[in-house]
Design a protein with these regions (language model features):
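Residues forming the flavin
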Residues: 1-52, 58-537
Length: 537
């Protein structure tokens, strides 16, 4: 199989033009092209004056591929296609003594459980929240009625925090074994649109993710796995440094010497329990900030120029970073084109925001986190739980600033830059539900973060015209950008000091986003299989 890269066609080209373009690129007869698939499709809109093209990477089979490779020996855009197929590490023995346990059923837990089930290990999966459809109802209860269910919300429940997001499926992680392709293929098998296999920035969207997650759950069950909801792990059972099981909130004990912790970044009670049991963990950097909303049409014009609104391009996104004079870095986080800002708390008396988009990305506003990096040594010394304590203080204060009713504190960008409280909305209507309370966001975060963001917003104007629009809205606060701690693991992917405990995913500090969490779930399932089967890594 061969791979062609950098094959360019106008964005309005008919689908049937792709085959002739491949044939022309290789200089072969049409009959000599046996088959082809899209591996990647992207575009580069940085030069507004140039005609916009789709840029394709194509995998193909052809007659006499050896001759073609010889002909294009000096052409870096024609090569042998790499083997991106996934190969399991082994199969479970027929006499498996104990089933592995997976704690958490977000992206990491789903893919860990799915892979273990595909290898015949019949995992027991424990999720503290509810099934995704009930979870959706509970989440809307907060958004519409300010009623929070601490065990069923944006953070907890089937599908994890990624269910209520943009459903982004791209990552900057190194993936030499192409495990990310396995993740994408499994999503497609479960009902995700096939285009996620080749578009450069794939996403599924919240409503579509719901059905995909349900289908993956049923795949696991069909393979002999067990998925249990409203099962919160309250203790780990350890004997002489060896994990032997977990205890649930109802008192039930499940015995296993292989437990994957796929907790997500908001399981603060579980982190505290693990710390109390002596499981090694350490503080890690994370970021805090606000959500910013602009009209999506403004972002489209700034990013796509004359192609703004083109049906083949959809809503434009962006990625920004600014290094402030005070030494802090400010960057856009989890940008959601055509989406909404959502209430994402999982704890009573606290306010935290996140962003969400549907597959269509057709809401009126674009939103993104604008966040500032913070470090444990400088900003929250005091041990591995200090970051959690900082998050809790900030979120509790945001609750008060919003009126103590789950409304969020908000401010117009122009007023924030000028250092004066907002008293009325302008042309941009905030999307956060249950609502916002206008005021002064300088009261919501540490002074160094406010200073850095105030400097960054006008600087971002140089990259996106209109970014510092006076009426754009900042909504607070964004604190759960990533886990504030890492449950450190060794080369066998087990806890440093508790054998049989396999920390994984975003909550353990080893992923950030759906794709990287899914990849880590597969890697951790492989590690469990190798340990059970006595295989070397």
């Amino acid at each position: 199989m061969l791979r062609i890269t950098e094959l360019k066609l106008p964005i309005d080209h008919p689908e049937e033009d792709l085959r002739p373009a491949i044939v022309q690129r290789l200089g072969i007869a049409s009959d000599d092209l046996l088959d082809f698939t899209l591996f990647k499709r992207s575009y580069d809109a940085r030069k507004k004056s140039s005609e916009l093209c789709f840029i394709y990477t194509i995998d193909l089979t052809a007659k006499d591929e050896a001759a073609l490779l010889h002909t294009f020996a000096d052409d870096r855009n024609v090569n042998v296609a790499p083997d991106v197929s996934y190969k399991v590490v082994g199969q479970a023995p027929a006499d498996l003594a104990q089933r592995p346990v997976v704690v958490g059923f977000g992206p990491c837990g789903i893919f860990a459980g799915l892979l273990l089930a595909q290898m015949g290990f019949k995992p027991i999966i424990l999720e503290r929240g509810t099934e995704v459809r009930q979870r959706t109802k509970d989440t809307w209860g907060l958004w519409r009625k300010s009623v929070l269910n601490p065990e069923s919300n944006v953070q907890f429940g089937e599908g994890g925090a990624g269910t209520f997001s943009d459903g982004k499926l791209y990552s900057q992680i190194k993936d030499p074994k192409f495990i990310g392709r396995k993740v994408l293929h499994e999503f497609v098998k479960a009902g995700a649109p096939e285009e996620i296999l080749y578009v450069s920035k794939p996403h599924i969207g919240t409503f579509r993710l719901t059905g995909v997650v349900e289908n993956m759950r049923e795949q696991i069950r069909a393979l002999g796995g067990e998925v249990r909801f409203q099962q919160r792990v309250t203790d780990v059972l350890i004997e002489d440094g060896q994990l032997v099981g977990v205890e649930l909130d109802g008192g039930e004990q499940i015995h296993s010497k292989h437990v994957i912790l796929a907790l997500g970044h908001s399981a603060r009670d579980t982190f505290r329990m693990l710390h109390g049991r002596g499981v090694f963990m350490e503080a890690k950097p994370f970021s805090v900030g606000f959500r910013i909303e602009h009209p999506q049409s403004l972002i489209d014009r700034a990013r796509l120029g004359k192609y703004a609104g083109h049906p083949k391009l959809g809503a434009a996104d962006y990625k920004l970073v600014h290094h402030a004079k005070n030494g802090r870095s400010v960057y856009s986080f989890c940008m959601c084109p055509g989406g909404t800002v959502v209430a994402a708390t999982s704890e009573p008396g606290r306010v935290v925001t996140n962003g969400m988009s549907q597959y269509s990305r057709n809401e009126r506003n674009a939103n993104s986190g604008i966040v500032v990096g913070i470090t444990p040594e400088v900003d929250y010394p005091g041990g591995p739980l200090a970051g959690i304590e900082l998050q809790e203080r900030l979120e509790s204060h945001a609750f008060v600033l919003g009126g103590s009713n789950y409304e969020a504190p908000a401010q117009l960008v122009g007023d924030f830059i000028a250092g004066k409280p907002s008293t009325a909305l302008g042309s941009v209507e905030p999307s956060y539900k249950p609502g916002v309370a206008l005021g002064d966001l300088a009261l919501a975060l540490p002074a160094f973060a406010i200073e850095a963001i105030r400097e960054a917003l006008p600087a971002f104007e140089k990259q996106i015209r209109g970014y510092s629009l006076h009426d754009a809205v900042l909504t607070g606060i964004e604190t759960r950008t990533s886990s504030p701690l890492r449950i450190t693991r060794n080369e066998s992917m087990q806890s440093l000091n508790v054998k049989g405990l396999f920390p994984a995913g975003e909550g353990a500090g080893y992923a950030g986003g759906i794709l990287s969490a899914g990849v880590d779930g597969i890697r951790i399932a492989e590690a469990v299989a190798r340990d059970i089967l006595g295989l070397e890594a």
